[in-house]
Amino acid sequence: MWDVMMWPIVACLLLPGLLVYLGMHVVRRGIIFVDIAMAQMASLGVCFAVMKHMDLDSPLTFWISLGFTLLAAALFAFTGKRTGEVPQEAIIGIAYVVAAAASVILLSYSTEGDEQIKNMLIGNILLVTKQEIFRTLALFVGVGVFHWFARKRFMMLSFAPEEAVAIGVSVKLWDFLFYATFGLVVTSFVQIVGVLLVFTYLIVPAVCGILTARRFGVRLAIGVVLSLAGGVTGLMVSFYQDLPSGAAIVCVFGVLLVLTGIVSIFIKEKPRRVDA
């Protein structure tokens, strides 16, 4: 078992922390589906590379995928929900649907289109390599360091946007930086685990943390612990029950969310505000 599961388990232990942190911001901003839309845009870039018969593991494929993701980052940053009558979730939903449809069209030119669509959705974390893990980890560390130094701006824009506007913060610029770094993380992770698992890692642990704690740091810690437990448990279930690993992990996270919701009824008082 260890020969097959070693690197997938390492990936589930090393990579989710930053995703949980970004998910906390996404949930607080009320743009729940931005992650799946960004992941789909990254996949659209990969589909374009497939249509052009490029090597999926080549740097060029990654940069093409990142380019599509940055286009989405610019779109979402400059159509922010703070102004205008059209909710940003509508723009995000439209972007997701169009990207998904375009991906299907591009893959129709590939002889292995159906298999590519399946991999795009649920990925195959069992095939992850040591090189992919540590390359992705290095990127995550870089993004994490940037967010640490810019944490005051990002926290203000997520938790006190009116205050940010009042003191003259360049909202669109900082939103773009958030979405761009977010897209960089999503682009690298979606190639390993697929669109659905990216969405799961970003949203479910963050929601579990919010359900059970008041302070941002405690919520983040709870989310990280649950993401580690959910990923490893899902891998074990998939191995012993001979199930698709990505789908098994998603279902385990669903069970964890239900259990967390039940527990939260008894342990958390309704807060008036979030202590960052």
List PLM regions with ranges:
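Hydrophobic alpha-helical segments within and immediately flanking transmembrane helices
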Residues: 18-22, 36-52, 72, 99, ...
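Cytosolic-side transmembrane-helix boundaries in multi-pass membrane proteins
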Residues: 36, 243-276
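Membrane-interfacial amphipathic/re-entrant helices at transmembrane-helix boundaries
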Residues: 1-17, 88
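Helix-loop-helix "hairpin" substructures at the membrane interface of multi-pass membrane proteins
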Residues: 129-205
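Small-residue-rich segments of transmembrane alpha-helices in multi-pass membrane proteins
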Residues: 39-48, 94-106, 127, 171-181, ...
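Transmembrane alpha-helical segments in multi-pass inner-membrane proteins
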Residues: 196-247
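Transmembrane helix-bundle core of multi-pass membrane transporters
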Residues: 83-153
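Short loop segments and helix-boundary regions at transmembrane helix junctions
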Residues: 24-37, 47-112, 209-221, 238-241, ...
